[in-house]
Amino acid sequence: DNKFKVSGLIFGEVWIKPLEEKFDLDIDVSLKNGKYMDEPFDEMIISLLYKNDMLHIDDISMTKQGSMGMQINGIIPTKKDSKSKKNIIIESNFSNLSLEFIHRFIPDFFKIDGRANGFLKIGGTAKKTTFKYDLNIKDAMFDAIKLGNIKSIGEYNGKYLLVKEVVSSTNNNNIFGKGRVPIDFNISSTNMGSFFKSDSITFLTKGHLEKLSFLSPYISDLDSLKGDINISLNLNGPMSNIDKSGKISIANG
């Protein structure tokens, strides 16, 4: 699994204490000039303790001087017990984090790219994971669409990604979206990053544009369409058979 592969010059200590059917693990290491999931870094720090079926993350951080930084800390219960009520508590802050790097963890999701700043707070359980996020993204790309600068806030409830707001601004084109997407982001899932195809999406997008060049990857003739343009697009229905509707009005075209 590539998620557990990391390269670089390593310094530090790893302490393991075998028990009857368990073990305690204490890791305090630093890696220099390496790669993780094909993302280069100047330094990665891993400081964590595994004991009594709990993973305590003091610090997992990855930095590339002048261009990227990411830090994670918290607690993850690892015991596979349906009666366990111990929750995940994870917080992450990041700056100039590559969304292409994030996409490698969820390859079945739409292609995404750009540089993200913000935070992510994860809770719930491994079986039913929840999180909240607040993101600002530069030079964003979703699928084949260039979206410029994006701000988005939302949360995940174990079944739906609830996008409270996503705002895109590029070249005097402004787009607003909100809705819910049925997708599996549960940590213990073997299908993490896949859509729940039997569940329904509800997503509304509105925009005020000067031209429709952002849609030209799909319909090339739209690239030359200019004016005072208002659009609305709706996605509804099961992921296996999405109903798409919308309207466009153009003035001074």
Per-segment meaning from a language model:
Residues 1-119, 127-253:
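Interface amphipathic segments
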